Amino acid sequence: MSLNDSIKRGEYLVKTIGCHDCHSPKAMTERGPQLIAELALSGHQAGDSLPPMAPETIKNGWMLMNGQLTAFVGPWGVSFSANITSDDTGIGNWSMQRFKLAMREGKLKGDKNGRMMLPPMPWENFAKLNDEDLESMFKYLKSTKAINNAVPAPIPPTRLDSLKSA
């Protein structure tokens, strides 16, 4: 497969598998959430605040998302969607090997000694993709517009009280 065909296949996979669902900020409209094109695949935006929430909500079995659909709250704490653009704050300095390790083993940033990715990242599904598909996705993501956005670190469950409403 040519490089151009591989990038097109990667774009198709990224769009149909649902990467934009979590990794692209949305604006809420009368028709529901709409992707903010200029922030596509850049993850949860650095500096964005989270709305207040009652930690009891999580203790009672609920999970929540913020309005941009890039922050997720559950028993694991708060996780933020990663920047997967070609910028160095995204996957710009990743190798194919790191990408495959992240997708196949769920290792954060493809670091074999690092922690596991947090929910709702469905890496177990991506682990089933063949090499050609993962390579095409990686080539497409590396071809995207670089968006500088250092996504915040997750908030552990022990700090959910910091999100309480006033």
What does each model-found stretch correspond to?
Residues 21, 29, 86:
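Active-site micro-motifs of SAM-dependent methyltransferase domains
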Residues 8-11, 88, 123-126:
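Generic anion/oxyanion-binding catalytic loop in active/binding sites
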Residues 2, 16, 143-147:
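Secondary-structure boundary elements
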